Amino acid sequence: MRPLFSLLLLILSSFSLCEKKKIIYLIRHGETNFNTDPVPKVRGRINVPLNEEGIAHCKAAGDFLANENIGKIYYSAIPRAKQSADCVAEHHNGPVELVEEPLVIDISWGIYEGKTYMEAFGDETGGDLIHHPEKLIVPEGETFYAVMDRLRLFFVKFWESDEEVCTIVSHGAITNVLSLMFLQAPLEKFWSMYMSACGVSKVQMKSIYSFTIEYWNANYFLKEGEKKYLKK
């Protein structure tokens, strides 16, 4: 029986070795004044540039990943994400191809963009945003379900490609939705895995529906980035 058992183990291990796996790095864009103002504002797809801290943090994220194989960087078309992707690429030790990817653009907050959160959501809608995101409806905007659908299309495209690794530079709402997809969690858990500005996550992809999070929201390097890159 022992030779048969050994053969079975060999067959099973060969299947394991042949299992297709890919790696996704996920980076949230750097800080903007809309994030850090005493009364923060809804951003979405309006153009808000990175502030000095945001630029320093992006450079630090690039340093953090400098020796990793990060593949192509797929970035949201919104300039703050492109600016963040550029900083990361500039501080990587190898050549990095940057690709604008419409499927990872920020959620459209419709008529709420540019307003303070209280102006946009008030008490009633704000309650849905915080406590019942699955019920949230944004006039002239997007639902979280629509965001999930387009992110799944990105997964399909990446999975079917020859690429083994990629990096996504996107936005807070997108990283929240991605965390739900990685964990197969319901939209009610939208706020459970929040990523800080310029946080970095690494995820193993086993299929378009199966993922393992290796680490989430690494950000310990940001303070060092402030010391190194902020103007005195």
Predicted regions, residues:
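Hydrophobic h-region of N-terminal signal peptides that target proteins for export
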Residues: L9-L17
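Sec-dependent signal peptide recognition
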Residues: M1-L7
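Loop-to-helix element that buttresses phosphate recognition and phosphoryl-transfer chemistry
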Residues: E31-K82, V88, I137-R152
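Acidic, low-complexity terminal tails and accessory targeting/binding regions
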Residues: C18-I23, G94, I107-M118, L180-K232
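Active-site metal-binding loops of divalent metal-dependent hydrolases
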Residues: G30, V165, G172, N219
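Short, hydrophobic/glycine-enriched beta-strand segments
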Residues: I23-H29
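Phosphate-coordination/substrate-recognition cap region in phosphate-metabolizing enzymes
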Residues: A60-G127, M193
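Residue-level preference for the first positions of well-ordered beta-strands
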Residues: I24, E163-V169
